[in-house]
Amino acid sequence: MTMHTIWHSMAWPLLKILGSLSLSLLVANLIEALNWTRLLSRFSRPLIRAGHMQDVVGASFSMAFFSGLAANTMLSEAHQQGRLTDRELVLANLFNSLPTYFLHLPTMIFVTVPFLGTAAAIYVGMTLGAAMLRSLGIVLAGRVILPPIPEGCVECQLPEKGPTWREALHKSWRRFKKRIAKICLITAPIYAAMVALNSWGFFTAAEKFIADHLSFMDWLSPKAASIVMFGMVAEFTAGLAAAGALLHGGELPVKEVVLALMLGNLLSTPMRAFRHQFPYYAGIFRPALAAKLIVYNQVLRAASLLVVALGYYFLG
């Protein structure tokens, strides 16, 4: 690899990730130091009460509408301080599916509409429904698995009056310095490994292997199956381009196009999620825990997409 390639494919993206992680860590520490978690948790209070979840989970849920990194950092800090158990951390991370989805919703709308036209509303609506299903499912799981929070104690662990800005900044900076070195030491080599595997064609080969062994897609027409293939071996927009061409040419009905896109989304995302999310997840959580969270998220995501797609297949 030349220096130019190393800079553009590894060094510069890694610097951006570490910069985002650093900013998110500072923001999360500052919010907690100022006791703003009390305010943020109020927006999701009915849901976290129903799910027997702690106040910091509600604060993280609200924060995830603006920054997924800051939301996860908030959960990691609470877990390290013993305020969240392993089980609560996993449920809290999965609970943030809906706000995390909303972070990407504008981009999804602006990308899908030019290709799919009115069919984009069905596709986006189905993926939104799947995200809502995931968060509501976690609320139900929390209600069954977690012990009830005493009435009136969603915010009771936080003091009424927070520290001054000077005190909060000092506390945030002190905690930031303790964690940032560890984050860099973990994130940098993992990101470098992901770039190396990608440059060696590992992920492309894995996606091609999956695409070549999709015998269960016999129920799809060859044209619809091509949408799935393009979405897997290339990028999401390649699948959209194929779908748009077939849709506007009258080659496929809307329903089959949408189902093909859903299937391509379901099959291609796990590998890409691991490739893109693991480096910064491992910087926020322990690497083993980071891998576990990504697996849980992808399993839940696949299950919710499958439920929504089956509902559309039989009822749409």
Where are the language model's segments positioned?
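Hydrophobic transmembrane alpha-helices of multi-pass solute/ion transporters
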Residues: M1-G19, R42-L47, A141-A181, K208-D218
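Membrane-cytosol interface motif
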Residues: L47-V56
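Juxtamembrane and boundary regions of transmembrane helices in multi-pass small-molecule transporters
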Residues: T5, I17-N29, L40-F43, Q80-Q81, ...
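Residue-level signal for the membrane-embedded core of alpha-helical transmembrane segments
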Residues: L18, S22, I31, F66-L69, ...
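Membrane-interfacial helix-loop connectors
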Residues: M63-L94, M108-G125, E207-F285
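Membrane-water interface at transmembrane helix exits
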Residues: A28-E32, S76, V113, G142, ...
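Transmembrane helical segments that form the transport core of multi-pass membrane transport proteins
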Residues: E32-S44, W173, K177-E251
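Long, highly hydrophobic alpha-helical transmembrane signal-anchor segments
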Residues: M1-T37, T100-Y123, M217-A238
